[in-house]
């Protein structure tokens, strides 16, 4: 979902599914947090979603508070902000270098995604490199790589940031509750 005028819920997207479960049946206008700036003068939307590592990346760039304020402003009364956020605050002192690889597809369509973490000395932030491998004719090939920096956010920090942005009810859903591998935060725009 990338443009306000052609917003269609993605049925395989757990964040959109969480929003639909809360809002009920019907068509819901869903906007990605990265598209909020372009949509700022558009009509209110039902849902603003933020994918897995977006909030920690925005926090590292000192842009999280402004992004959440803008998300709140584009939502209709009762609209939802839904975000998947890794909870790595307890891992900072352990400084793991990578989670297990993610494997998708079968046979010639198989892909492997690997994350590499390089922690700051204080454990409060980390560099993240994501490498996606695909099957070539005879060997694995690097399809693409992405490198970013993230700040570690505790559940308390996430809750406070959402509340400070003007959201009413703020709730954290565990992976078992929401079907996403990461905890998902749901915040309601007040009436």
Predicted segments with their positions:
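Class I SAM-dependent methyltransferase SAM/SAH-binding core
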Residues: 24, 28-47
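A short glycine-rich, Lys/Arg-flanked "PGG" loop and its adjoining helix->strand segment in the class I
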Residues: 63-77
